[in-house]
Amino acid sequence: MREIEENAGNHKILIFSQFLKMLDLIKGHLEKHKIKYEYLDGKTTDRADRVNHFQEDESCRVFLMSLKAGGVGINLTEADYVYLVDPWWNPAVEQQAIDRTHRIGQKKKVFAYRMICKDTIEEKILLLQDKKRDIAKDIISTEDGFLKKLSQNDIIDLFS
C-alpha cells in the first residue's frame, strides 16, 4: 500500500482484485489517507459516469475494480499504473484488465504489477498461468500446432 500511496501523487492507478472484500480493505486504506478514488464491481450501474469521473478529474487518482467487471469494455487511458492484487488462474483475464490502459489516446508508459506473496498458492497460480500460456502458444503458433494441421473441412466440421 505504501507504493500505491507514493504513486498516487503523480500517477493515476488502476487496482484490480477478484475479491470484493479485498477491494473493501483497500478502499478503507485510501479513505484513511484521503486519496480520492472511484469504484466499480459487477453491481455498479453507473459505469460510464465512474469511468468519466476517473478520466476527467485530476484529483481522482485511483480506480478500484473487480477483475471481472473491469476487465472488458472500458478504456482508462489516464491510468499509467496497474496493480493486480491477487492472481487469477486465467492469464488472459489479467491481460484484459491491464489492457484497459493500452488504448488509443494513451500517451504515457504503463507499468503493471502483480502482487504475489512468496511461498503461497499465488505462486502456484502463476505456474498454472505459465502452463496455460505455453499450451495456447503451442496450439496456435507453432508449425506442429493443432490449428496449423486443420483442413478447411475440419474447421467447417467444428463450427457446424
Residue ranges and their predicted role:
Residues M1-S160:
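ASCE P-loop NTPase motor core, strongest for the SF2 helicase catalytic module
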